[in-house]
UniProtKB/Swiss-Prot annotation:
Its cofactor is NH4(+); K(+). It comes from Erythrobacter litoralis (strain HTCC2594). The active site is at D110. PANTHER family: TYPE III PANTOTHENATE KINASE. A monovalent cation. Ammonium or potassium. This is Type III pantothenate kinase. Its EC number is 2.7.1.33.
């Protein structure tokens, strides 16, 4: 079995794969100070609950946008599983696609995994939208070449700025507004409308501009924790794939095994 870990700015997602099928997944808050031993205490208990012996894991791969976490994950893999992990974007796990951009080496691992998985799963010209700490949009041509993208503040970052820079506005929970009205009747509704519909308008507008620049029809694949929430209020997505990033790790591990 393959153990994959995606280290994001907010959470670390672990997934256990049998082939390309996800058998189990677990999530823990990202903390660069968390040691390999602490990861092991948490993860080995979850594997036991799942009925998996650590010896059944034969390959480990991780991707990280938090460099300070990498050493501790490597300790986890080597000390508790006896496996040298593949690191996404490095060595045998180098990205197996072309990046037609100015600085290919600056492409974040999470974005690269989305590019790889989207092309593998859906093909054709694509725009991938990932709703994370930042909202990221990627343009991929029919050959799987990465053509560039956009990084914008995520909806929670927008809300944090709104609340943090004002004296009286309250903290609210992000959710889909109950009605299509964009005229709120109280402060909390007005804030929700402001951050939610502004994000939808930004996303839809950017996608249409990207499609026009690409010059060919491009399917839109949405991923990230809030993708389903936005899918309720827009029809611009062709596919919503919550597992796109983590599945990218399984695909990358397959490529690495052939090296």
């Amino acid at each position: 079995m393959l153990l994959a870990a995606d280290v994001g700015n907010t959470n670390v997602v672990f997934a256990l794969f049998e082939g390309r099928d996800i058998r189990a997944r677990w999530r823990i808050a990202t903390d660069p100070r968390r040691t390999g031993d602490e990861y092991a205490v948490w993860l080995l208990q979850l594997l036991q609950i799942e009925g998996v012996q650590r010896e059944e894991i034969t390959q480990i791969i991780f991707a990280s946008v938090v460099p300070r976490a990498n050493h501790n994950l490597t300790v986890l893999c080597e000390k508790y599983f006896g496996i040298a992990p593949l690191v996404a974007g490095e060595g045998k796990a180098a990205w197996p696609f072309q990046a037609d951009v100015d600085q290919p080496s600056s492409l974040g691992a999470d974005r690269a995994l989305n590019i790889l998985a989207a092309h593998e799963k859906y093909g054709g010209d694509l725009i991938v939208v990932d709703f994370g700490t930042a909202t990221k949009l990627e343009a991929i041509d029919f050959n799987g070449t990465y053509k560039g993208g956009i990084i914008a503040p995520g909806i929670n970052l927008s809300l944090d700025a709104l609340v943090g820079k004002t004296a009286k506005l309250p903290r609210i929970a992000i959710r889909a507004p109950e009605t299509a009205s964009v005229i709120g009747r109280n402060t909390e509704d007005q804030m929700l409308i402001g951050v939610f519909w502004a994000h939808v308008a930004m996303m839809e507008g950017l996608i249409e501009r990207m499609r026009a620049e690409i010059g060919r029809p491009a399917k839109v694949v949405a991923t990230g924790g809030l993708a389903i929430l936005f899918d309720e209020k827009t029809d611009i997505f062709d596919h919503v794939d919550a597992d796109l990033t983590i599945e990218g790790l399984a695909i990358l591990a397959e490529h690495a095994s052939k090296q």
